[in-house]
Amino acid sequence: MSNNIPPIRYRRKITGMSAILLPLLSETEIDWSGLRDHVARTADAGLIPAVNMDTGYGNLISSRERLEVLRATQETVAGRPFIAGAFVGDSPDAPFDFDQYRQRIDEIQSFGGTPVIFQSYGLTHQPASQLIESYARIGEHAGSFYAFELGTMFAPFGAIYDLEIYEQLMRIPQCLGAKHSSLNRRLEWQRLQLRDATRPDFLVLTGNDLAIDMVMYGSDYLLGLSTFAPGEFARRDAMWEQGDSDFYELNDLLQYLGFLAFRAPVPAYKHNAAQFLKLRGWIQTSLTYPGSAQRPEADVAILEEILKRLDA
């Protein structure tokens, strides 16, 4: 596979999917009104809401909370599309648990969503042939799904697949696309080249919040960063499709926000998201789910300066 940079694809219509932050009223109480408002805000902007992802603490919330998020999302989108994380928690020595994945898929589909298959130790620790067989079983049961490559800077159970495995994943017809979260342009460019040669309708969904201009090269996106500013992301995407040079200035400002929020430790971006949404008056507190990484309060002043520039 060549490492050449793929060409820029001007005036392309971008598919945007935005992970939804789960807001809190207290350490033990979810802000359901704030969640519904943010799902509506995202869908109204023209982006596809993605719930129970990392941004929504999909690996931390209880099964009751997970189902309530799905119910609230279904009611809010009112027939519009949404996707949701299918997370199976396990341990490093656990076998692949198809039954747990099947249950998560059934839950999501019962509320009208399309599943995004989170990795797990049991899934990613398999030999390549068994790994692909597991995804094929998931596809046969789900009918349609999105895969998810997650770098270990986000979660210890994640894995970035080699290109041979990625090609086999693309050949599973029920797999509509895959989120790629390596934070590495070169690896994502390779996937775009492989996609173009193998299955042009397959969505390479960038999860690179440090390189949101990957959409210029043919990636679509499923980002946590867009939860900070779904309307601005939608406006940026429309500028690209229209050939509007203002795309670059807005993209630069959104990327500045991404560099701040997604610095190490990367999982603490969710605290920055809560701080930013509170500054916007969209949620009531900047609390995060118990067990989440935190940012210093000093970040708020920088976030406020970015918000003023976005609103200018």
Residue ranges and their predicted role:
Residues 2-160, 292-295:
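Active-site beta->alpha loop and helix N-cap motifs at the rims of alpha/beta catalytic domains
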Residues 3-6, 18-21, 46, 219-220, ...:
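C-terminal alpha-helical cap/extension of soluble enzyme domains
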Residues 31-34, 38, 65, 69, ...:
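General structural feature for long, well-ordered alpha-helical segments within catalytic domains
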Residues 72, 137, 168, 235, ...:
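Alpha-helical scaffold segments in soluble metabolic enzymes
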Residues 140-266:
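Catalytic alpha/beta core domains of metabolic enzymes, predominantly
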